[in-house]
Curated annotation (Swiss-Prot):
Keyword Membrane: yes
Entry's transmembrane regions: 6-26, 35-55
Lineage: Bacteria, Pseudomonadati, Pseudomonadota, Alphaproteobacteria, Hyphomicrobiales
Name the UniProt record assigns to this protein: UPF0391 membrane protein bsl5717
Organism of this sequence: Bradyrhizobium diazoefficiens (strain JCM 10833 / BCRC 13528 / IAM 13628 / NBRC 14792 / USDA 110)
HAMAP family with a match to the protein in the record: UPF0391 (MF_01361)
Pfam (any one): DUF1328
């Protein structure tokens, strides 16, 4: 859950920076948020597949 929380924090930083006119910082933090979200999704899917197949009791 920590990766998702950091992705949301970077998303909020991106929105605030965009509203204040810092477009470079906004784009960079949006890219970081997108990357962290994709990492979260990949980890979630891997653990879901492992839970449904290998670790079935």
């Amino acid at each position: 859950m920590t990766i998702l929380k950091w992705a949301l924090i970077f998303l909020l930083v991106s929105i605030v920076a965009g509203v204040l006119g810092f477009t470079g910082i906004s784009a960079a933090s949006a890219d970081i948020a997108r990357f962290l979200f994709y990492v979260f999704v990949v980890i979630f899917l891997v653990l879901l597949i492992l839970g449904l197949t290998i670790f079935r009791a």
